[in-house]
Amino acid sequence: MPAHLRTGIAGEDAAFFELRRKGYTVVARRWSAGTLDGDVDLIAWQGPMLCFIEVKTRTARDRTPAEAAVDRHKQYVLRGLARAYIRHLPQGDPPPTRFDVISVYLVPGEKREFMHFENAFGWN
């Protein structure tokens, strides 16, 4: 497996455990609708709020923060995936939702760092 994929998986794993530590209930990892491009890294409940979470991982610090990689196109893809996921929920009013981004820094020789951006972008 290429190094960048191993790094991404390590970051998603770290974010998963950090969310659980914070009391989230993670219900899906790397969820894909099958027909749409991409996947949602983590889907979790924080109380009544359904959170669609994109994780960006870096092993070095550069000028551009990791969360900046969630550009307009990625946001568009995540919105489509969220709609598909919500359609699979039991009938009734859709739950309140939000889109979060978690930046994970796994820099050798440094303590692991998380930056959690709740409600990083919306439905529009």
Regions found by a protein language model. Give the residues of each.
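Acidic-basic catalytic patches of nuclease active cores, encompassing PD-(D/E)XK
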Residues: 1-30
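Catalytic cores of nucleic-acid endonucleases
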Residues: 2, 34, 57-108
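N-terminal polybasic phosphate/anion-binding patch
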Residues: 15, 36-38
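Hydrophobic residues on conserved beta-strands that form the core of alpha/beta folds
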Residues: 26-28, 52, 99
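Conserved catalytic cores of phosphodiester-cleaving nucleases, focusing on short active-site segments
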Residues: 40-63, 78
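Short, low-complexity, polybasic intrinsically disordered segments
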Residues: 104-124
